[in-house]
Amino acid sequence: MSELEEKDAIREVMAEYCFRLDNDRFADMAALFTADGTWDTAFGKGTGRTEVEALVRRIRGTAPRPRAIHHVTNIAIKLDGATAKCFSNWVTVQNSEQGPKIGSAGSYTDDMVKQDGQWMFRYRKIDRFVHDKA
């Protein structure tokens, strides 16, 4: 694959992460990580797919919450063979009684690796710097 094709494949994984997270497909989201991959959030850190899935389930909880979707922007990808360092920004938009609103925003820092022809997260750091005070 060319460098452009590799970068596009990485962007597809980033998009799939959001689709799976936004649709409560947590096991499928965790499957985008390597077997020893780490999901590092403001609410905790999970290493390995089982821990990643358990952490997202704990964070999301069981209480009803407004529907929200992630938007990822300003994606920068630095390829180095079968590894990549990625930086991007994200924002969530959610429903509220007053209409759509920004729920939270921040940045992702990713270490990705290509395994068996698939790009996967080895490490995803989420810096959440815009959010409701509640």
Predicted regions located by residue number:
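A solvent-exposed, acidic/Ser-Thr-rich amphipathic alpha-helical stretch
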Residues: 26-91
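Short aromatic-glycine motifs in intrinsically disordered, low-complexity regions
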Residues: 63, 99-101, 113
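Short beta-strand edge/turn micro-motifs at domain boundaries
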Residues: 85, 105-133
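Short helix-to-loop capping/linker segments positioned immediately adjacent to catalytic or ligand/cofactor-binding
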Residues: 18, 62-65, 97
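Short, surface-exposed coil-to-beta transition loops
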Residues: 70-72, 103-108
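Short, low-complexity N-terminal intrinsically disordered segments enriched in polar/charged residues
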Residues: 1-31
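Short, solvent-exposed loop/turn segments at secondary-structure boundaries
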Residues: 43-44, 97-101
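Beta-strand elements of well-folded, non-transmembrane domains
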Residues: 92-94, 128
